[in-house]
C-alpha cells in the first residue's frame, strides 16, 4: 500500500526546498490546525527546483504518470496537522525536509495511512474535508492504521485515495525548526 525511500535526494536539494518554504512570502492557505500551504501545479511552480524534483520523480518512478498539483506545508512547531482525508489523485508523494535534529517527539511528525478508502458515493467535500464524517466512518469500519515515522529526506509514495493524516507535529522552538513537507500529486499511468 505504500513505498518508503530514505535519502533519495542530495542534501543540497533538501536544504534548498526547506529554505524556500521557511523564507518565502507565499502563503496560499492558512489552516486552523496549525500550518499554511505553498501551492503549485503543472503550469506554475514558485521555485524551479520543484519542477526538477517532479521530473526526477517521474523518471525514477514512471508509474506515477502525469503530475497534477502539489504544495508545501509549513507547520507550527506544535500542531495537530492535517486531519484525516483522502485526495482525488492516484498517487501522493510526500517528501519531508526538516532535519531530524529539529524533532522534539519522535513518536510524532510522521504520517498515518488508514487501510480504507471512502465510499464511492461520497463527494470530494465529504472525503476531503468533512472531519466529523470521516472520523465516524473510520471508527464504524474499525479501520486499521499504519504510522510512517518522520525522517528528513524520507520519500513516501501511497495511493492518495486511502484516508491519511499527519501524526501530529512536535518540533523544537524557533521558525527554522518548523516541520516542512512537500506533497506531489500524480495521476498515475
Residue ranges and their predicted role:
Residues 2-65, 71-81:
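Non-heme Fe(II)/2-oxoglutarate
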Residues 65-189:
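Catalytic core of non-heme Fe(II) oxygenases with the double-stranded beta-helix
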